[in-house]
C-alpha cells in the first residue's frame, strides 16, 4: 500500500536437483520490481519470465539460459497510466518461437504475435473494444480463443463474450452471440466447448457448441418454477449516464417483494468501494 517502507523483494533462482546447486538469476532492473515465472522451455534449457516495475506501468518479457544464467530481454512494454494485471496475459508457444503478448498501447487491450527474438510478427486483435483473458489455444490449428468486451452493440460491455482468432493474422470471429455473460470450457481437441451463460435476469443455460459457434445440443437447464412460486423476482438491469453526460454506467435494481408502483421508496446504493474499481455483477 502507499507509504509502506518494508516491501516484498522478489528474486529468481535456478535450482539443479541432480547437481544440488542453486543460483540466483541476475534479473534486477527496477527497485522493488515484481518477478513472475511464465513457463520453462521444453528441454529445460531456458525459463521465460516477466518482471514488472513497481509503478506497474512497465513490463519486460525475458528468457534466461538455465545453464549460463544469461538473461535476454525479448519485449519491453510501457502501459500508461497502469498495466491491467487482471487482464495481462503472455503465452509462450513452440518452445518460445511464438509469443502472444497483450498490450494497451493503442488505448485498447489487444494481442500481438512476436517471434522468439522479440520481433513483432503481426497484430491479432484490434479495434475499439477490449480483448481479455485467453480461454484456450489450439496449437495445431494455430487458433486462439479469448474473451472480449464491448465489441458487440447492445450488449453490456462487462459481459464476457468468446471469440476465436488466428495466431498468424488479424481478425476475430464471435462464437457466443447470446446477450449474456459467458464461460467456456473446451474439450481437449478444441473442436467443441461447453458454453455456460446467464444474466441476473435470465436463468443459466448450458450448451455444447463446436468451434464455429454452432449449438450442438442443450446440456442442462435449471427449473426455476419453485423459486418464482416462493415470490422471487429477478432484478432489473438499467443504464444511466455518468456526470459527464456521455459515459454509460450499468447497474441492477432489486425492488421489494411487495413493490407498489404508486409508492416512493428510498434507494440504497451498494457497490464494491475498492480503490481500483467499482463493480456490480449484471
Predicted feature locations:
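Beta-strand C-termini and the immediately following turn/loop, strongest in propeller blades
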Residues: 2-6, 39-43, 48-55, 65, ...
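Short, small/polar residue-rich loop motifs at catalytic or cofactor-binding pockets
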Residues: 8, 32-34, 57-58, 86, ...
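A short loop-to-beta-strand structural motif that recurs across blades of beta-propeller domains
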Residues: 11-13, 60-62, 110-112, 161-163, ...
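Structured core elements
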Residues: 14, 24, 39, 48-49, ...
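Extended, hydrophobic alpha-helical segments in both membrane/secreted and soluble proteins
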Residues: 44, 57, 70, 86-87, ...
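Serine-hydrolase catalytic core recognition
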Residues: 50, 174, 181-282
Amino acid at each position: 500500500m502507499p507509504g509502506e517502507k518494508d516491501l516484498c523483494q522478489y528474486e529468481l533462482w535456478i535450482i539443479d536437483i541432480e547437481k544440488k546447486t542453486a543460483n540466483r538469476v541476475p534479473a534486477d532492473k527496477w527497485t522493488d520490481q515484481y518477478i513472475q515465472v511464465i513457463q520453462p522451455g521444453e528441454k529445460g534449457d531456458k525459463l521465460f519470465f516477466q518482471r514488472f516495475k513497481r509503478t506497474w506501468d512497465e513490463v519486460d518479457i525475458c528468457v534466461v539460459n538455465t545453464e549460463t544464467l544469461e538473461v535476454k530481454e525479448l519485449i519491453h512494454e510501457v502501459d500508461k497510466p497502469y498495466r491491467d494485471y487482471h487482464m495481462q496475459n503472455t503465452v509462450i508457444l513452440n518452445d518460445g518461437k511464438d509469443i502472444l503478448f497483450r498490450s494497451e498501447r493503442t488505448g485498447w487491450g489487444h494481442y500481438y504475435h512476436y517471434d522468439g527474438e522479440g520481433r513483432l510478427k503481426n497484430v491479432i486483435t484490434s479495434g475499439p473494444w477490449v480483448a481479455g483473458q485467453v480461454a484456450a489455444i489450439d496449437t495445431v490449428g494455430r487458433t486462439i480463443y479469448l474473451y472480449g468486451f464491448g465489441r458487440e452493440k447492445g450488449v453490456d460491455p462487462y459481459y464476457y463474450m468468446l471469440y476465436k482468432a488466428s495466431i498468424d493474422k488479424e481478425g476475430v470471429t464471435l462464437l457466443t452471440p447470446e446477450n449474456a455473460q459467458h464461460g467456456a470450457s473446451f474439450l481437449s481437441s478444441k473442436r467443441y466447448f461447453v458454453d455456460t451463460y446467464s444474466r441476473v435476469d435470465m436463468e443459466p443455460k448450458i450448451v455444447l457448441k463446436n468451434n464455429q459457434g454452432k449449438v450442438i445440443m442443450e446440456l442442462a437447464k435449471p427449473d426455476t418454477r419453485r423459486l418464482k412460486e416462493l415470490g422471487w423476482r429477478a432484478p432489473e438491469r438499467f443504464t444511466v449516464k455518468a456526470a459527464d453526460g456521455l459515459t454509460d454506467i450499468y447497474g441492477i435494481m432489486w425492488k421489494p417483494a411487495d413493490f407498489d408502483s404508486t409508492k416512493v421508496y428510498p434507494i440504497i446504493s451498494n457497490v464494491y468501494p475498492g480503490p481500483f474499481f467499482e463493480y456490480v455483477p449484471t
